[in-house]
Swiss-Prot record:
<dbReference type="InterPro" id="IPR045058">
    <property type="entry name" value="GIMA/IAN/Toc"/>
</dbReference>
<keyword id="KW-0547">Nucleotide-binding</keyword>
<feature type="region of interest" description="G4">
    <location>
        <begin position="154"/>
        <end position="157"/>
    </location>
</feature>
<dbReference type="GO" id="GO:0005525">
    <property type="term" value="F:GTP binding"/>
</dbReference>
<protein>
    <recommendedName>
        <fullName>GTPase IMAP family member 4</fullName>
    </recommendedName>
</protein>
<feature type="region of interest" description="G2">
    <location>
        <begin position="64"/>
        <end position="68"/>
    </location>
</feature>
<dbReference type="InterPro" id="IPR027417">
    <property type="entry name" value="P-loop_NTPase"/>
</dbReference>
<feature type="domain" description="IQ">
    <location>
        <begin position="233"/>
        <end position="262"/>
    </location>
</feature>
<dbReference type="GO" id="GO:0005829">
    <property type="term" value="C:cytosol"/>
</dbReference>
<feature type="region of interest" description="G1">
    <location>
        <begin position="37"/>
        <end position="44"/>
    </location>
</feature>
<feature type="binding site">
    <location>
        <begin position="155"/>
        <end position="157"/>
    </location>
    <ligand>
        <name>GTP</name>
    </ligand>
</feature>
<feature type="binding site">
    <location>
        <position position="191"/>
    </location>
    <ligand>
        <name>GTP</name>
    </ligand>
</feature>
<feature type="region of interest" description="Disordered">
    <location>
        <begin position="1"/>
        <end position="25"/>
    </location>
</feature>
<keyword id="KW-0175">Coiled coil</keyword>
<keyword id="KW-0597">Phosphoprotein</keyword>
<comment type="function">
    <text>During thymocyte development, may play a role in the regulation of apoptosis. GTPase which exhibits a higher affinity for GDP than for GTP.</text>
</comment>
<feature type="binding site">
    <location>
        <begin position="37"/>
        <end position="45"/>
    </location>
    <ligand>
        <name>GTP</name>
    </ligand>
</feature>
């Protein structure tokens, strides 16, 4: 059975604004996705299916295998696909302080803001406990975040020959209301799928995400926390790049001192030229090393646990 998904609900043009929707990101080389949901919903397996590789630990377990927010990256359709897996931070028994801490880390990993927030819920019995966890999750985001949310229903294979529309007609009313709240944006996933089936459901999900991004005017979700995080990240990235630049200068000075001391004691001009050539090679090698460090400075900052937001 092919993966099924609904179309994206229409958003009236006059109801959109930069403040409500976020910041324009048309032509972005990135597509940033956050996986949200209760422990055991299948977030990590879903992330692996989307990325096409095992980036996150996953398994059948009553306790969350994912302990902190983690990021995986791959390339899809010419874009850098960034997927952030979250632990069961919205489980009803998780303290709000722990939830807030991981939200802060998630913000750092997806700054300047995610294009899609995927709420992962397994098909089957949608319990009162699961509904409470969902409401806790939604309460952590402003209402505008709904425009960036997609309901991702895992364990699609449990449907067997049952049509998804028939299933949803008999689903709990609160689940039907959730689909309506997400403007009828939902997608089915079989995390046991492989090969062509896995690629097809991934394609359909990411097509739905891109369709939603277009409906949102090419914008990504942002709020004051994201704006604050981006400011912190940019500042720390600049500091790290400056540190690497100064470190390169110190390394060049050290290399020059050592070689010039050697060259000064040499009487053979040919040997002097050899040492100068060797010194230039070391200069070039060090420049390449530090250029790569500067290029990766932002990623280092994003992955650090030292980003704190007020």
């Amino acid at each position: 059975m092919e993966a099924q998904y609904s179309g994206v609900g229409s958003i009236p043009e006059n109801s959109r604004s930069s403040h409500e929707l976020g910041i324009q990101d048309q032509g972005s080389p990135q597509l940033r996705i956050v996986l949200l949901g209760k422990t055991g919903a299948g977030k990590s397996s879903t992330g692996n299916s989307i990325l096409g590789r095992k980036a996150f630990l996953s398994g059948i377990c009553a306790k969350s295998i994912t302990k902190v927010c983690e990021k995986g990256v791959s390339i899809w359709d010419g874009k850098e696909l960034v997927v952030v897996d979250t632990p069961g931070i919205f489980d009803t028994e998780v303290p709000d302080a722990d939830t807030q801490k991981e939200i802060t880390r998630c913000v750092a990993l997806t700054s300047p803001g995610p294009h899609a927030l995927l709420l992962v819920i397994p098909l089957g019995c949608y319990t009162v406990e699961e509904h409470k966890a969902t409401r806790k999750l939604l309460s952590m985001f402003e209402k505008k975040a709904r425009r960036f949310m997609i309901l991702l229903l895992t364990r699609k294979d449990d449907l067997e020959d049952t049509d998804i529309h028939e299933y949803l007609e008999t689903a709990p009313e609160v689940l039907q209301e959730l689909i309506y709240e997400f403007r009828n944006r939902y997608c089915l996933f079989n995390n046991k799928a492989s090969g062509a089936e896995q690629e097809e459901q991934k394609r359909q999900l990411l097509t739905l995400v891109q369709s939603m991004v277009r409906e949102n005017g090419g914008k990504y979700f942002t709020n004051k926390m994201y704006e604050s995080a981006e400011g912190v990240i940019q500042k720390q990235t600049w500091k790290k790049k400056e540190f690497y630049r100064e470190e390169l200068e110190r390394e060049r000075a050290r290399i020059r001192r050592e070689y010039e001391a050697e060259i000064q004691d040499l009487r053979d001009e040919l040997e002097r030229e050899r040492r100068r050539a060797r010194m230039e090679r070391e200069f070039n090698e060090n420049e390449l090393i530090f250029a790569e460090r500067q290029q990766n400075a932002r990623r280092e900052v994003e992955n650090t646990s030292m980003i704190y937001l007020n």
